[in-house]
């Protein structure tokens, strides 16, 4: 690992799930180059009894099991060794469907930190007391439920690592993609020029860069207005525009 490289530490019952897809393509190459590092902390050895139990029945009754606060705390303590205590420099995140929605802005903030600890839940979740005691931020990948946090953790790390300098190679790629300016990305095309009687928009073949830029901006605005009205309203509010105004999108 290169000095000062961004670090990801994952507390999980399934350390064998990593690096998974993070070990492939550009993120995998960057991992090999030492541009970032990945460490898993297996929750099971912190469990109690002969079977290293990590969970118990939910207080108040109900289905499923809950990860115990004392056991998760020991794992988080192990994961925190050598990390700064300030959460702005080293966020500690629990993947949860009730958390704040993950966003590109969040990924940018995390990429600017020294590293990140991710707690992957299982069963019915984690005892709330340990989340409160350790100032753990709850983050959601979307309005759906997974069997555990490992898949979500890989997605969040991928979104963050690709923003680290030199990982993608072409920095312009991150400036033009979806959410970089609060908009969805414009449509992309490549050869052949004609496919199944469908042609590439003529403006993209014109070589007129100003016209191409205007077309791409208009398409990005059109798609955002159609598909993500929430993003569209925020985009317009930041620019003093009426989100209901038609502007030849």
Swiss-Prot record:
Key words of the record: Cytoplasm, Methyltransferase, S-adenosyl-L-methionine, Transferase, tRNA processing
One GO MF term: tRNA (guanine(37)-N1)-methyltransferase activity
Record field: catalytic activity: guanosine(37) in tRNA + S-adenosyl-L-methionine = N(1)-methylguanosine(37) in tRNA + S-adenosyl-L-homocysteine + H(+)
Leading EC class: transferase
Keyword Hydrolase: no
Keyword Methyltransferase: yes
EC numbers for this chain: 2.1.1.228
Family as reported in the entry's similarity comment: Belongs to the RNA methyltransferase TrmD family.
Name assigned to this protein: tRNA (guanine-N(1)-)-methyltransferase
Source organism of the structure: Cereibacter sphaeroides (strain KD131 / KCTC 12085)
Gene name of the encoded protein: trmD
